[in-house]
Amino acid sequence: MVTSIEPGLYRPGKWGIRIENLAANQAVANPQETEFGSFLYFETLTLCPIDTRLMDTALMTDGEIDWVNRYHAEVRRRLEPLTEGAAKAWLIKRTEPLAR
């Protein structure tokens, strides 16, 4: 099953932001049965860099910065071999790690 993950924030009459990815629900390779059953995980399908130019890292937790950096590392790892020239340069620039 494919799910849309769409966290967003909208200020009425002002502005809004939404970051959206499509993800496939996948079974864990070696599931550990718990009192709640076994779990699934999300495999990201839409591997698109998140535009970080308006992110203020002073307002972000270390965990949030780490999540963006891990996501961008995965986007680059999977897409860089498929790109060349200007597209590759753009991908590398847009997946640079965030720093404080």
Which positions does each model-derived feature cover?
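Charged, cofactor-coupling segments
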Residues: M1-R100
